[in-house]
C-alpha cells in the first residue's frame, strides 16, 4: 500500500483556480465516494480550506492512483488535466507523509503556526471516516498526523505568540490588564478587523461588548453575535465611560476620536485608566490622546512590532517543530514498512513451502517405496534446506522494515522472487528466463536435488 498527495495552495495557484478545486463540507462525503469509484483508489481523504485543497490517497499503484486523481479534479473543476497540473503539487511516499505532518503542524500555512489547520485536518479525517473511504494506512497516517500537530503545539508553543493585528491587539490588552476576565470593550467600527479582534477578546475573557458604527444596523448585527450592546455613533463618548478597552477600526479619512473628546471622557472617569487600540489606517484616534493621563494608546505600528517579535519566536519554534516531525515521520515509516514486509515474508515462506512440497512429491515418486522413517528424514532435510535458505532474507527484511527505505527492500524482494503479495503489486516485473537449462536425461537442474535425496536414502538404509 502506497501514499500520495496531490494538492493546490496559496503558493501554487491564484484564487480563481483554488475556487474551482475547493470542496464544501456538506458535499465532501459524496465527493469522497465519487473519487473511490475511480480505478486504483483504495482509500482517500480530502483536506479543503480557504487556502488549500489536498487529496490524499493510498493506492495499490502510484501511477494509476494519481492518474485517477487528475481525472477526478478535472471532472470536478471543468479544467483540463494539463492545466490543473500547472497549478498543483504532487508528493509520494516519504514526502507525502512529511507534507501532511508539516501542514497539520502549521508550518505550511500562510500564517506560520496558525491553529485552525489542526482542526481542519481532523475534520477532513472524520468526514472520510463517515464516508468509509479510508483504509488502515490512511487511518494510521491521519491519526499520527493529528498527534504530531498536537505535540508540536504543546512542546514548541508555536501558536502562543500572535502574528496578526487582531491577535496582537488582544496580546497588548492582556499585557496591560494581566487578565481580561470581566473586562468590557467598546468597538468603534463594525468591519472584519473589528469582529476578529472582538472574537479573540471574548475568547480571552472579556464579558461586555459595546459596538458603535456610523451604520447603526451594522453595529446591531455585530453586537448580536456577542450578546452585546449596539449604540449610535453620536452616543460613542457617552458609552466610552463603561469601557476598559477601546478598539477602533473604521474607514474614516480623519480622526474619529479627538483629543478634546477624550479629555472630557477622562474627566468623568476619575483616574480610571483606559486602553485604546487603533488598528485603522489612516488612524482613527488622534495620537495626541496618549498625552492624557491614564490613557494608553497603541496604533498599528505598535501592533506590528508585537507581530514581528512574535513571528521571530514562531520561526525559532518552527525549527524545533521540524525535529519533532522527523521523529514522528520515522516512526510512521517504520510502521508502514512493517505493513509492507509482513505480507512479503508470508509470501516468501509460502513460496518456499510450495516448492518443498512439490519437490518432495517428485522425489517420493522417483524413489519408489519408502518407509515412514525415510519419508520423515527426507521431509526433515527439505524443511532444513528451505528454512536455512529463507532465514537471512527474512531477518534482513525485518531489519530493513525499521528504516525509512524498508518498503524499497520489500519491493525488491517481491521482484527478485516474483512474489504475488495480496494488496501489493511490484512496480516493475522480473522477466523470467525463456527456458530452463537441460542436463543429461532430460531433467532440469533440480536433478541434483533428487540425487542428493537418493544418496541420503541409501545411506539411511545402510544404517538400518
Curated annotation (Swiss-Prot):
Domain of life of the organism encoding this protein: Bacteria
EC number(s) reported in the record: 1.2.1.70
Record keyword NADP present: yes
Key words, A-Z: NADP, Oxidoreductase, Porphyrin biosynthesis
Binding-site positions, NADP(+): 189-194
Broad EC category: oxidoreductase
Transmembrane segments: none
Amino-acid positions noted as binding substrate in the UniProt annotation, renumbered to this chain: 49-52, 109, 114-116, 120
Site positions per UniProt: Important for activity: 99
Reactions catalysed, as given in the entry: (S)-4-amino-5-oxopentanoate + tRNA(Glu) + NADP(+) = L-glutamyl-tRNA(Glu) + NADPH + H(+)
InterPro entries, per the entry: 4pyrrol_synth_GluRdtase, 4pyrrol_synth_GluRdtase_dimer, 4pyrrol_synth_GluRdtase_N, GluRdtase_CS, GluRdtase_dimer_dom_sf, GluRdtase_N_sf, NAD(P)-bd_dom_sf, Shikm_DH/Glu-tRNA_Rdtase
GO BP annotations, alphabetical order: protoporphyrinogen IX biosynthetic process from glutamate
Keyword NADP: yes
Molecular function, one GO term: glutamyl-tRNA reductase activity
Pathway this chain belongs to: Porphyrin-containing compound metabolism; protoporphyrin-IX biosynthesis; 5-aminolevulinate from L-glutamyl-tRNA(Glu): step 1/2
Residues annotated as catalytic: 50
Family of this protein: Belongs to the glutamyl-tRNA reductase family.
Domain note: Possesses an unusual extended V-shaped dimeric structure with each monomer consisting of three distinct domains arranged along a curved 'spinal' alpha-helix. The N-terminal catalytic domain specifically recognizes the glutamate moiety of the substrate. The second domain is the NADPH-binding domain, and the third C-terminal domain is responsible for dimerization.
Miscellaneous note of the record: During catalysis, the active site Cys acts as a nucleophile attacking the alpha-carbonyl group of tRNA-bound glutamate with the formation of a thioester intermediate between enzyme and glutamate, and the concomitant release of tRNA(Glu). The thioester intermediate is finally reduced by direct hydride transfer from NADPH, to form the product GSA.
Annotated function: Catalyzes the NADPH-dependent reduction of glutamyl-tRNA(Glu) to glutamate 1-semialdehyde (GSA).
Protein name, entry field: Glutamyl-tRNA reductase
Gene: hemA
